[in-house]
């Protein structure tokens, strides 16, 4: 099975706004708001102390610093860019992930691609096709406004 989807994410510190598969997820630093327009539903949740809070784009760029052993892998030319892959092997053998391949753009020194190989052989690829840095955002960009969603069911 091959399936491709795209989305956008904006990250500032620990706060983020993710738009993916028709839904929006917003983390304002304290709570996560997941808006699903198809169902007209909003779920609001708070992370517990020390909890890994599921998808967290703000951790995407440094998740590998703990819990993985790593080694150099292949270097590829991708669309004129030199991408150096690093193989990340989970320290915990009971993980559902066999290994990850983290592709680094050598010139930009940024993550270009993340490939996850599951213990069951499933392959998931995330490609960061465009990254903008040091952009100005409105002060309320990461603020949830319930009035923008009239008639939505809000699940606390």
How should these model regions be labeled?
Residues 6-8, 23-24, 69, 99-103:
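Short, surface-exposed charged micro-motifs
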Residues 28-40, 63-76, 117-124:
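Short secondary-structure transition/capping segments
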Residues 47-82:
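Flexible, surface-exposed loop/linker segments and immediately adjacent secondary-structure boundaries
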Residues 26, 41, 54, 59-63, ...:
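Residue-level preference for alpha-helix termini and adjacent loops
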Residues 1-3:
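An N-terminal domain-cap segment
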Residues 6-54, 124-125:
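An acidic-aromatic
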Residues 71-154:
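Gly/Pro-enriched, hydrophobic low-complexity segments
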Residues 19, 52-56, 62, 96, ...:
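Short, functionally important structural connectors and interaction interfaces within domains
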